[in-house]
Amino acid sequence: ADCLWGGGRVGFGDHDSAEILALLREYGISARLTFSNSLLREEHLSDRKCNDLCALFEEGGDQRNGVIVHSDLLLAYLKQQYPGFYFVSSTTKVLTDFEDLRGEIDREDFRYVVPDFRLNKAFAQWDTLTGWQRDKVEFLCNECCFFGCRDRKQCYEAVSRKNLGEPGEHRCKAPGAAGGYRFSKAMKNPGFIGVEAVRDTYLPLGFSDFKIEGRGLGSALLLEFLLHYMTKPEYHLALREELYLENTLDLF
């Protein structure tokens, strides 16, 4: 959180990075640093906080850790300075043209590529990919943004400027933007991929990697994501009760 190289959203937090890494190692989970700022310049590469995080997370133990990246400048720097990482091409690139996306998938730099969510249902095009290309695709499942938005790239660039401490606020003009994120709204989005679609459509097509957005939305929404995507329906109520009755958990 609060990193110069960050993008996608502005985040703040005070959790201990070493403790987070230790927890992920305990459960065998690959960590990813989200460094998707699209407007980085040469002078930003020496940022101490971001480099310290890279030095810490590059040593992933049994699980290799990764970096989600937008800037090719940062990508080249990270490949040279921290070769232990794998790299993920960020959805903040807003690649809505399928041939542009195909070119991104074909780049050897990336283990995974996250398409713009508006390509999620482009099944005729997805069917043209080879097996190894499908292995590199990671779908963003639960985007809530307006499907017809034309300013998505500008919105991400505004976040990048904010992380750099530069002016240039973006005011979203999309329908319903003032209401903020709602999972119920995301489920009605034409690009939404629910757990049934993962199981019945995408897995049979050879796609096995999926991304859930919303890490900064608060525990209550994160709980709903985890219930929908990672918990069998018959356990939903029992899990909710356990968490609601845990008075040390800040859900709201």
Predicted regions and their residues:
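Active-site pocket-lining/capping segments in soluble small-molecule metabolic enzymes
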Residues: A1-D100, E104, F110-F252
